[in-house]
């Protein structure tokens, strides 16, 4: 590539040696505040003015033996050298400087990142911006929008200014994009055109043969995501070994086998040059992309981005494409998600991609803020100024940007597991944790059963999420691969393949829209479901060491004792209050203020959460739910919901007919649960439960123990009773009916095993499933240890249990075939 240099000759040796330097080139951060310079900045910016070239160069002082300035520490770099430079001499300084008058003071600005010697004649001839700067001050300032572009500015921008040819094939797309921004900011049109031409050449040369559709799908089939357990190659259904990919469209010639392998390998690389070039151009600032040589380049990159991400589900499995999408600017991400040509099997993929984008943006903003705070602390410790929050600093999405992002999802087309926008789906329960999305989620569902009822009762605003109510998120993050917990949404977004494929394409227009779909989406027949992922696991298993169980039992026992003390105190105070009322205000009662502050009734034992759950790290997806194993310790009365089920939560005293799906075994389990409301025997529950991401209020309502304020309002059921107050029985029944959609009515597993590593003094710890659990009709979905508080709280029992090598005895459970 032949590029006209800014200077007609190669003057780069002068830049390396500092010969005839008569000015300085200062690199600064454009995002730093203007008042970032204080008195200590004199260490970076020497106050000495540039000296004029002497009349007799032969009598000049010898050059300084010190190294070239590269860290901003001041040294005298302005003394001319006794050499003749290409038949020219440096321009003499102004008369004021020659007469001993100081040069014009530098304007207050950010601290320099780097200071190098410069030459006025070269800089002034290269750019009108440098010419204007050197006419009023002693330094040529290069402002960087991003500090990461400092190497490109120091090595490439100055090399072009001084006439050194650049090695264009060796430059990465990110470096070329940085050169585009630097050349646009410093009025170097030749460098800008050369960088734009190189990026266009990369996009044309690296584009997959025959279009990115087949190549992206083939690369996605060959990528082993972190969720594949155990790691395995692509199955025949995924287009792997044993199944040949269909031929590309007739319009494009079929590439050779070797070329196809190269394309797939390039897309599977961690850093793809083609994807990096697209992302670098799309990420250009608006003022740079909309002017000069970047106009056509930016338009081409946007078209290629939509082309590569058109088959969105296949592109999401390619690491380079997924990383490129998560790093896009918000306008580009909105253009991708809102594109009418985006082909997905269900709208849940788009919703989870939006969640992943917001999570990534928030995480990177937090990391950037932490880095800025660290730099500010280092600057304060060194006497310098702080780091400012300029326009280039990444920040989380505000409310308007979040609404724009999630507005790209067509919620009325949301299909999950064959159902349209129901509450008992994993995606709906996950997304509803964001309060600002409630109005968007209820769009188009005013008459869709539970969604419309809750929207009418709560005014479109959901219940406030409880931070400690969803401990399953930690297990979900741990099950999603070797990622940090803060990136759990990124990992959960990769699980979109578990949703049922309904072939609900976003493109509209019947047969005319088929031409806009990617080739892999236009194949005959439904898209095969991926295999090898976590949701296709045939079993769940969980190991809990006895040491962990012992600690959990101690914590639960302490909570139960504390709750019992509070309960006795409250009962005694209420008895005193009643005696005081009957005695006509005699002595011995409680004060009126204390009596008014006391609750009207003692809370039932089953309504107080004292249990502790140990959740397994593995998940299995089936029938719209994520299933997980859990070992829970607590009083028996706290497991009424698991024993009776939400369908039998309505009290039998209401006189209404039983629900049609209530079997005799379920009714018997409900009666047994009511009889055990005061049973505080400590038990160990081992079983399977759905991961619903519910709040505490929702779980309590599903258990029939309470109704959230938004679910049974003033005008709700039973409102025309005593003074407009809702009847308690009717409110509980209404809450249980609403919550019945959130929980499965009955759960079955094909195999359920719980065992120990050895026998214990009182027999095997796992003696269930007990007859009480059998009566619930759950057929092996749970086990209640037949060891009451006398055994679980016995020190001798645990001393024998943990007496193995390093206390490694465990309770092991395994289930298979969850229904």
UniProtKB/Swiss-Prot annotation:
InterPro entries: SKP1/BTB/POZ_sf (IPR011333). Its main location: cytoplasm. It comes from the Eukaryota. Gene3D superfamilies: Potassium Channel Kv1.1, Chain A. This is Proteome of basal body protein 15. Keywords: Coiled coil, Cytoplasm, Cytoskeleton. Residues 46-72, 564-590 are annotated as: Disordered. The keyword Ribonucleoprotein does not apply. GO terms for cellular component: centriole; cytoplasm. Residues 546-580 form a coiled coil. Residues 46-59, 572-581 have a biased composition (Low complexity). It is found in: Cytoplasm, Cytoskeleton, Microtubule organizing center, Centrosome, Centriole.
């Amino acid at each position: 590539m032949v590029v006209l240099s800014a200077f007609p000759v190669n003057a780069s040796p002068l830049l390396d040696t500092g010969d005839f330097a008569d000015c300085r080139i200062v690199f600064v951060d454009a995002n730093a505040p203007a008042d970032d310079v204080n008195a200590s900045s004199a260490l970076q910016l020497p106050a000495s003015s540039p000296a004029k070239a002497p009349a007799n160069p032969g009598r000049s002082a010898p050059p300084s033996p010190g190294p070239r300035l590269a860290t901003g520490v001041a040294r005298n770099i302005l003394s001319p050298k006794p050499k003749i430079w290409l038949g020219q001499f440096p321009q003499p300084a102004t008369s004021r400087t020659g007469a001993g008058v100081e040069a014009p003071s530098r304007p207050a600005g950010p601290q320099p990142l780097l200071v190098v010697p410069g030459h006025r004649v070269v800089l002034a001839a290269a750019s009108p911006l440098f010419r204007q700067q050197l006419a009023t001050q002693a330094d040529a300032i290069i402002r960087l929008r991003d500090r990461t572009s400092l190497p490109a500015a120091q090595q490439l921008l100055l090399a072009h200014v001084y006439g050194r040819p650049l090695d264009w094939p060796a430059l990465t797309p990110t470096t070329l994009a940085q050169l585009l921004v630097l050349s646009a900011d410093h009025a170097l049109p030749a460098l800008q055109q050369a960088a734009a031409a190189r990026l266009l050449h990369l996009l044309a040369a690296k584009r997959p043969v025959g279009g990115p559709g087949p190549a992206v799908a083939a690369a996605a089939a060959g990528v082993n995501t972190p969720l594949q357990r155990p790691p395995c190659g692509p199955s025949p259904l995924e287009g792997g070994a044993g199944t040949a990919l269909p031929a590309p469209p007739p319009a494009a010639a079929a590439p050779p086998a070797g070329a196809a392998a190269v394309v797939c390998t390039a897309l599977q690389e961690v850093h793809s040059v083609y994807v990096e070039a697209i992302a670098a151009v799309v990420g250009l600032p608006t003022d740079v992309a909309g002017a000069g040589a970047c106009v056509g380049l930016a338009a081409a990159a946007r078209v290629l981005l939509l082309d590569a991400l058109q088959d969105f589900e296949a592109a999401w499995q390619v690491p380079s494409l997924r990383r490129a999408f998560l790093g896009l600017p918000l306008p580009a991400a909105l253009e991708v998600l809102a594109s009418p040509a985006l082909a997905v099997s269900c709208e849940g993929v788009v919703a989870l991609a939006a969640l992943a984008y917001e999570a990534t943006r928030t995480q990177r903003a937090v990391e950037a803020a932490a880095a800025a705070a660290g730099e500010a602390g280092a600057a304060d410790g060194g006497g310098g100024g702080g780091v400012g929050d300029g326009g280039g600093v990444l920040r989380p999405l505000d409310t308007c940007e979040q609404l724009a992002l999630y507005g790209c999802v067509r919620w009325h087309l949301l299909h999950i597991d064959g159902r349209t926008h129901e509450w008992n789906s994993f995606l709906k329960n996950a997304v509803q944790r964001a309060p600002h999305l409630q109005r968007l989620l209820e769009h188009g569902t005013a008459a869709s059963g539970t969604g419309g009822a809750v929207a009418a009762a709560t005014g479109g605003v959901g219940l406030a999420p409880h931070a400690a109510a969803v401990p399953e998120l930690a297990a979900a993050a741990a099950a999603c691969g070797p990622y940090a917990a803060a990136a759990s949404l990124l990992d959960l977004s990769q699980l979109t393949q578990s949703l049922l494929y309904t072939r609900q394409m976003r493109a509209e227009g019947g047969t005319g829209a088929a031409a806009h779909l990617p080739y892999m989406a236009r194949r005959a027949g439904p898209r095969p479901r991926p295999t090898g992922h976590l949701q296709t696991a045939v079993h769940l298993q969980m190991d809990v060491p006895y040491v962990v169980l012992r600690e959990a039992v101690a914590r639960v026992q302490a909570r139960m004792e504390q709750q019992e003390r509070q309960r006795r105190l409250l009962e005694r105070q209420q008895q005193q209050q009643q005696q005081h009322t009957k005695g006509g205000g005699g002595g011995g009662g409680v004060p009126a203020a204390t009596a008014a502050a006391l609750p009207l009734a003692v809370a039932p034992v089953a309504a107080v959460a004292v249990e502790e759950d140990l959740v397994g790290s593995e998940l299995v997806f089936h029938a719209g739910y994520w299933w997980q194993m859990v070992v829970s310790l607590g009083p028996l009365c706290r497991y009424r919901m698991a024993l009776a089920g939400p369908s039998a939560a309505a009290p039998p005293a209401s006189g209404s007919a039983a629900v049609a799906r209530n079997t005799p075994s379920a009714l018997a389990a409900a009666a047994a649960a009511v009889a055990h409301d005061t049973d505080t025997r400590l038990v160990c529950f081992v079983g399977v439960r759905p991961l619903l991401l519910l709040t505490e209020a929702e779980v309590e309502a599903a258990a029939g123990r309470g109704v959230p304020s938004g679910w049974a309002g003033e005008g709700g059921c039973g409102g025309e009773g005593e003074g407009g107050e809702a009847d308690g029985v009717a409110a509980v029944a209404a809450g249980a009916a609403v919550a019945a959609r959130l929980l499965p009515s009955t759960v079955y597993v094909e195999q359920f095993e719980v065992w120990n590593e050895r026998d214990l003094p009182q027999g095997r710890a796992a003696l269930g499933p007990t007859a009480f659990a059998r009566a619930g009709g759950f057929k092996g979905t749970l086990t209640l240890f037949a060891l009451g508080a006398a055994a679980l709280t016995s020190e001798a029992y645990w001393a024998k249990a943990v007496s193995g090598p390093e206390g490694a005895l465990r309770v092991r459970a395994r289930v298979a075939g969850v229904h």
